[in-house]
């Protein structure tokens, strides 16, 4: 579950774009303007939500040439938080994220395609020692000058990953085989 969340987190970072004249952005996690969230069904009765609190990443963005855009994200899996200490401890164990052996999850984009108002960001997500392709559907939320003399761009992305694809085989029941990723990032343009 946490592993899938990491995958989504990486995916969210992928939703940024770039080109030959693309601007490079650093994800603004220090200003609390970036979130890597996930949700998974609990026994088919409700949604269990979580987040990764410690991650870093960059992206390039060029509206005129999205196919050249790049996204790179690293998530510290130990930072998983579902607002329940015992569950978080279990998610960090070898049954799920195995943070002792695999302390980081990474996402590196391999392609970005514009589909209407959205971007399909495909990349390699490495989670729990397994690397698989993941596609995120992303949308530009806005871009422009900030009040401090800089430039920013913000994206929201969603995607799904299957736990078993990342060697997370704990049986959580038929309703809990996929993790939904919900990523929201704001990047600060680098000079």
Curated annotation (Swiss-Prot):
GO terms for cellular component: periplasmic space. SUPFAM superfamilies: YceI-like. Keywords: Periplasm, Signal. Its main location: periplasm. Disulfide bonds: none annotated. Pfam families: YceI. It is found in: Periplasm. Residues 1-22 form the signal peptide. It comes from the Bacteria. The keyword Signal applies. Belongs to the UPF0312 family. Type 1 subfamily. HAMAP family: UPF0312 (MF_00780). This is Protein YceI. It comes from Salmonella agona (strain SL483). The lineage of its organism: Bacteria, Pseudomonadati, Pseudomonadota, Gammaproteobacteria, Enterobacterales. The gene is yceI.
């Amino acid at each position: 579950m946490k592993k899938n969340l990491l995958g989504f987190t990486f995916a969210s970072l992928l939703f940024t774009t770039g080109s030959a004249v693309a601007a490079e952005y650093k994800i603004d996690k220090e200003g609390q303007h970036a979130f890597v969230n996930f949700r998974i069904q609990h026994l088919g009765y409700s949604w269990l939500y979580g987040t990764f609190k410690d991650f870093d990443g960059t992206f390039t963005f060029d509206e005129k040439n999205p196919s050249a855009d790049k996204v790179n994200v690293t998530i510290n899996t130990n930072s998983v938080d579902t607002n329940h200490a015992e569950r978080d401890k279990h998610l960090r164990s070898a049954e799920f994220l195995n943070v002792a052996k695999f302390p980081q999850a990474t996402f590196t984009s391999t392609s970005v395609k514009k589909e209407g108002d959205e971007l399909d960001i495909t990349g390699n997500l490495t989670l729990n020692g397994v690397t698989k392709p993941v596609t995120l559907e992303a949308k530009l939320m806005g871009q422009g000058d900030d009040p401090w003399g800089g430039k920013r761009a913000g994206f929201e992305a969603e995607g799904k990953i299957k736990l078993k694809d990342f060697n997370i085989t704990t049986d959580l029941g038929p309703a809990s085989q996929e993790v939904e990723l919900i990523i929201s990032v704001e990047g600060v343009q680098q000079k």
